[in-house]
């Protein structure tokens, strides 16, 4: 039986513990209520590794673009009086989900995981604990071809990066597809680039408010992947964006890529085509806009897919345009003139950038087999991916990427089409962007990511795919419940450190002397660092010959064959057919010779 003294001691201990819990609870709640320029927001503490991170999810940064605000630039937010509960992700912006492979995690992981709504202009903040003072800020911009994407995806969770590197991570939703990029250039009611103006307003929000979260508005680095990287590089070119950030990281995308910016005429034609499809063909722009604003967003989504021919792949239906406001000229021109923010950039690409696009309609390709394609299927693939290119242009690609190599392996056409798409759309534009940037004396760093994740659900032949460095940038391999390897955790920690060092100091090496120094990229030697699970190495002039083909030779071929008459066209077509016959004969003869030699040895 317990003594009276023991009971009193236990009661005292319980009261003390209860008091400690209450004090701790109130202290924690007080810590996670932040006062912004628009009002107070409540966040939450998340356990991360051996500590915590404070997360604020779903903070509004603009008025909902509803009704008369549809298709317009985002409007500044008014103040609220209550405490905004920022403890769960907000709506995703309206978009078409990828339904090509239902239930397959490789494609489903990129689909929106919150409700779709036009009321979607919200951002997220992850801050290390205890609350920092003047911490570097890293703002993530998601990709998705300007057609899809949301900041709430698990692969974009900022908690590990905030915890390990003690930076503040911010991400925002922005409008995509027709609702974000429909354009009647020159008309303020539907100016185009609304999604980019959304991003820009989020950057302004960070400048005004991030100090309240412990961040330094004078140390802000933008980073993004694919169309997100294209967006980041457009902010480098946009005079109104340039004062709103410090540095930039571009992962597998740049604004000078062929898909990143469309002409004014093309943008207007697509807007009028969409209007026609949904019954909004009117006599003037005012009536068209009024009609489009009254349409259900789901109807707009369904019809925006029809604007580009179905046999065209890798097409951005609605994307950035030269509006004279956000973007004053084509990116190539601005780069040539040196009209971009003078700062430091970190740029890079993945080893197999093209494969992710091949399983979405290229002849002979499938995620369920090895996709060993024929010469004819390769040629059909070129027609789909280069719809406006002449036969002679496509034959030049075939000759350079296949015939010139005299490769006898069965995989040669599959690998060649991967290289063609990756070089043309991602790798060579990124290298060209970095080269132009560095020529004016700006510090640039370039990486080549070559590790295939052990958790990748796509088939082995697809290699180190477009988009699959992101999980390492955000530290997902540090999550013990997911079965990444120890080497992958080390790689992820290394990449997070490189990215954070660059954000803090403008140099991925930081202030420490590591075993392998990441050298600056100069236009003369073009040094770059490989990122893998073994050991990083420094090389020079990545894909230099292939990029010369796209920047120098290929445009000349198109120029020289653009105006040939029909007789010469027929003669050349006949010559190429003869050349194909000769290639087949050569292959059969080599096969015959090989068999003859093997028989002679019997």
Swiss-Prot record:
The modification Phosphoserine is found at residue 226. GO terms for biological process: acetylcholine catabolic process; choline metabolic process. One of its GO terms (cellular component) is plasma membrane. It catalyses: an acylcholine + H2O = a carboxylate + choline + H(+). It is an enzyme of class 3 (hydrolase). The keyword Disulfide bond applies. Glycans are attached at residues 85, 134, 269, 284, 369, 483, 509, 513-514. The keyword Ribosomal protein does not apply. Its EC number is 3.1.1.8. Keywords: Disulfide bond, Glycoprotein, Hydrolase, Phosphoprotein, Secreted, Serine esterase, Signal. Disulfide bonds join 93-120, 280-291, 428-547. Substrate binds at residues 144-145. Residues 1-28 form the signal peptide. InterPro entries: AB_hydrolase_fold, AChE-related_enzymes, AChE_tetra, CarbesteraseB, Carboxylesterase_B_AS, Carboxylesterase_B_CS, Cholinesterase. Its main location: secreted. GO terms for molecular function: acetylcholinesterase activity; cholinesterase activity. PROSITE patterns: CARBOXYLESTERASE_B_1 (PS00122), CARBOXYLESTERASE_B_2 (PS00941). It is found in: Secreted. The active site is at 226 (acyl-ester intermediate), 353 (charge relay system), 466 (charge relay system). Homotetramer; disulfide-linked. Dimer of dimers. Belongs to the type-B carboxylesterase/lipase family. Esterase with broad substrate specificity. Contributes to the inactivation of the neurotransmitter acetylcholine. Can degrade neurotoxic organophosphate esters. PANTHER family: ACETYLCHOLINESTERASE, CHOLINESTERASE. This is Cholinesterase. It comes from Panthera tigris tigris.
